[in-house]
C-alpha cells in the first residue's frame, strides 16, 4: 500500500530563475532507490489546492535519509510550495512510477543522458547511480537561457557535460540536438527526460537503440486511478491500447508510446 509521510524541510533555496531546490528528510526516503521515479507533494492542508504536485526525484542520500527535489515555481501550487521554509513539513506520497532501467547497461559501458529544462533533475540521481555501477556518463543538458540553467558543476563531476541554451547565453546556441549533431559522442545506452518536443526528437534519433525516455505530464492522482495521464501505445491502430504515465511510466523504451 502506498503511504504518505510528513517530511521535514532541511534546506530550501532558489538555484536558478524560478527553479527551487528543496531537501527533506523522512523514513520513506530509504525506499526511493530507483532513479526516474517521482513523488506527489501536497502543497498545504487547505482545501484550495486539492491536487498533489508530481516532482521528480533529483537525489537520495540513503545514509541521512535526505531527499532532494528540484522544481519550477510557475503555478499557484508550486509558488506556494516555494514559500515554505526550513523546519516546516510537507506531505509527500511516494515513491511512485517506474524508474530508468539500470540493468539495461553494464559496468564499463557508456550512458548518454539527455535532459531539457525541469527534465534535468531526475538525470542527476541516475548519473550518480550509473557512476557507482562503474559506467561512464556523458551529459547533454538543454535550457532556455543561462539564467535558467542549474547543476552544471554537479553533472560535470560525474562525466563530460555539454550545455545548450536557446538564446546562446551558455554553451551551444540552440537545442540539445545541436550538441548531438556537433559532437561525435560514443555511447551504449541513452536515457532522456524533458519536454515532449525534445523527447520526440530524441526518439526519432535513437529509435531501435537501447534508449529510454521519461515523460513529463500533469497528473491527478499519481497512482493510476484517475486516467488523467494516459498515452497511446505505438502501432495500435484502433487507439484502444494505452499506458498510464504515473504507474506504467514515466519511463518507457523509445518507440513504445506515442508522443
UniProtKB/Swiss-Prot annotation:
Kindly state which keywords UniProt assigns to this record, in alphabetical order: 2Fe-2S, Electron transport, FAD, Flavoprotein, Iron, Iron-sulfur, Metal-binding, Pyrimidine biosynthesis, Transport
Pfam families with a match to the protein in the record = DHODB_Fe-S_bind (PF10418), NAD_binding_1 (PF00175)
Kindly tell me the pathway this chain contributes to: Pyrimidine metabolism; UMP biosynthesis via de novo pathway; orotate from (S)-dihydroorotate (NAD(+) route): step 1/1
Q: How is the cofactor bound?
A: Binds 1 [2Fe-2S] cluster per subunit. Binds 1 FAD per subunit.
Q: Which GO terms describe its molecular function?
A: 2 iron, 2 sulfur cluster binding; electron transfer activity; flavin adenine dinucleotide binding; metal ion binding; oxidoreductase activity
Q: InterPro entries, alphabetically? A: Cyt_c3_hydrogenase_gsu, Dihydroorotate_DH_ele_sf, Dihydroorotate_DH_Fe-S-bd, Dihydroorotate_DHASE_ETsu, FAD-bd_FR_type, FNR_nucleotide-bd, OxRdtase_FAD/NAD-bd, PyrK_electron_transfer
Which residues of this UniProt protein bind FAD? 53-56, 70-72, 77-78
Indicate whether Transport appears among the record's keywords: yes
Asked if the keyword Iron-sulfur belongs to this entry, the reply reads yes
CDD domains per the UniProt record, alphabetical: DHOD_e_trans
Its required cofactor(s), as named, are: [2Fe-2S] cluster; FAD
**Subunit record text:** Heterotetramer of 2 PyrK and 2 PyrD type B subunits.
Q: What does this protein do?
A: Responsible for channeling the electrons from the oxidation of dihydroorotate from the FMN redox center in the PyrD type B subunit to the ultimate electron acceptor NAD(+).
Q: What is this protein called?
A: Dihydroorotate dehydrogenase B (NAD(+)), electron transfer subunit
Native source organism of the sequence: Halalkalibacterium halodurans (strain ATCC BAA-125 / DSM 18197 / FERM 7344 / JCM 9153 / C-125)
Lineage, opening ranks: Bacteria, Bacillati, Bacillota, Bacilli, Bacillales
